Amino acid sequence: RDRSPSRGLGDVYKRQYYLLMTLSRNCGKMLWILFLFLFFGAFQIVLLYLFGQSIIAVDMFLNLVTTNSSEAMELLGNLTPAIVVVVILYIPALVLATISIVRKRMLSAAFIRRERKRAFVVFGVSLLSLAGAYVQDPGYELKSDLYPLNVCYNVGLAFQRTALTQNYHHTSKDFTFHAQATHPEEKQEVYVMVVGETSRALNWQLYGYERETNPLLVQQSGLVAFPKVLTESNTTHKSVPMLLSDVTACSYDSIYHRKGIITAFKEAGFRTAFFSNQRFNHSFIDFFGREADTFDFIKEDSLDFSYNPSDNELLKLVEQELAKGAKKQFIVLHTYGSHFNYRERYPSGDAFFTPDYPVEAERKFRDNLVNAYDNSVRYTDSLLARLIGMLENQGTDAALIYTSDHGEDIFDDPRHLFLHASPVPSYYQLHIPFLIWMSDSYREAYPEHWEAVTANKEKNISSSSSFFPTMLDLGGIKTPYRDDSQSVATPLYKMRPRVYLNDHNEPRPLDDLGMKKQDFHMLEKQEINT
C-alpha cells in the first residue's frame, strides 16, 4: 500500500495547523511552538527529493544516530537543491517569527475569533473526509497514513528501539547457541563470510550484465552465483544483523536477545575474526563484530576524519589472521563495497569505465554514476578473487560466502530514484548478488554440500534467511538455531514466500509495500518469484 505523505497532506493536515495558529495572537510565538513540525516538514522535503515518496520512516530517524559522519558528509554534499529549498522556505519564516516575538506584534482579537470559527468548520468537514477514508480503505491506519501523526508515531518507535539497543548487552548476556562442531577435529579448515555494501545483482557480469564487472570471478572454479536472491531489508542497520544472526524479517524483534554467528563458531572451538571497512554505527553490527577474538574497524584506526581506505586493506588483516595458523578459523569481512560516493570506493588508477566524474546526485550525471558504480563492482570482483586465492594457497578445507546488504537505485527509470533505504523499496534495492565458493579439498571432503549448492542455484532465495544457516552448514556447526530448510548447502532447502521487513519491523509480502509496476516488471524479467 502507498505510504506517501500525499495521503495525509490534505484538509486534515492543513486545517489542524491553521486551527493551532489561532491559539495565540502572536503568530511568531505559535510558529516556534510548532518548530518540531517545521523540522518534520524540512526533513520530509529532503526525503521527497531523494525518494519521491513516503513519509519519514522509523529507519530514517535511526539513521540519524547510526549513520557515521563520513557517510553523512558524502550524502549531504549531493543534496544541495533540497537543502536550498529548505533554507528558502524555513529560515526566513523563523526569522520573521522571531522578529514578531521580540516586537510583540499581535493580531486583533476579532480577527483571531473569526479565523478560529472558520478553522473549526473546515476542520470538522475534513474529519468527515477522514471517516470516508476509513470506509473506502479498510486498511487505513492513523499511525501509518495520517501525517503528521504517522511521523510522531515513528519518532516514538525510534526512541523505543534506541532504548532497547542501549540495553542489548544486558538482554543478550545469557544467550548461547549450544553450538557443536561436527567436522573431524584433526582437519584444518577456514571459513570466510563477506558482507558487501550496496551492490546490486543487475550490475554483475556473473548475472548476465553486458559489461565486464566480474572479469576474475567469471573464470573462478568452485564458485556458484545464485541469480534469484532478494534481501529482506534495504537498510544496512537491519540487513547486516540479519545476515550475521538467525533473526529474519519474521523474527526481527528477537534480535535484542540474540548474539551473532561469530559466537556460534566460537562455541564450536573456532578462532574468530571480524574486520570492517565501516565506522562504528553503535548498533548490532558493532555488537556482533566485537564478539570475535580479533576485531578491527579499520576506519576507526585513524584520527584523520578524511581517512578513506579501500576494501583491499582488509586483505592485509586476513593475511595476518591466516598466518596465525589456527586449525579452525572463521573470518567475517564487512566491506564498503559500492556505497555512495561510488567514485571514492576504488583507487583512481583502477577506473576501468570512464568518465567516472562528476558524480553528483543528479539525473544528468547518470552515465558517470553508472561508470563509477560499475568500477566499484569491478573492485569487489578483484577483492573476492584475491581473497579466494589466499584461501586456495592455504591448501586446507575452505569455503567462502558473499552477499550484499542491499542494492541501489541509480536513476534507472522514469521515477528517477536514487540511493537506497527508501521507505518503499524498489527492485533495484532488493535484488543482490549471492556467491558461494568451495576449495577443491572441501568439495572432495563434503561433496553433498557442493551437489546441494549447484542443485539449489536457480531457486528463489532470501539472503536474510539463508546466509546464516548456510554458513553454519558449510562450517559443520550444529545448533538448534540453524534452520536447515533455509540453508542452500543442503537438499532440505525449501523456498518460502517472499517477505520484506517493513519500517515497523513487520514481515510483509512484496505486494503490500507500495512497490510500483516497474519493480514487479523487473522481478518478472529476472524470473524472480514474488
Give the ranges of each region predicted by the language model.
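A long, amphipathic alpha-helix that forms part
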Residues: K316-E319, Y357-L400, I436
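Histidine-centered active-site microenvironments of extracellular/periplasmic hydrolases
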Residues: G208-E212, T396-D397, T403-P447
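Active-site rim elements
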Residues: L142, A249-S251, S302-F305, R366-R378, ...
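Short beta-strand segments
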Residues: F274-S276, F330-G337, D374-V377, A399-S404, ...
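Metal-dependent active-site segment of extracytoplasmic phospho-/sulfohydrolases and closely related
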Residues: V192-M193, S376-L419, F468-L472
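Active-site-proximal alpha/beta segments of enzymes that process anionic O-linked groups
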Residues: V125-M193, T198-E360, S463-S464, P469-Y493
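Membrane-interface soluble catalytic domains
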Residues: C27-L31, T263, F280, G389-N393, ...
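Transmembrane and membrane-interface helices of multi-pass
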Residues: R1, R7, D11-Y147
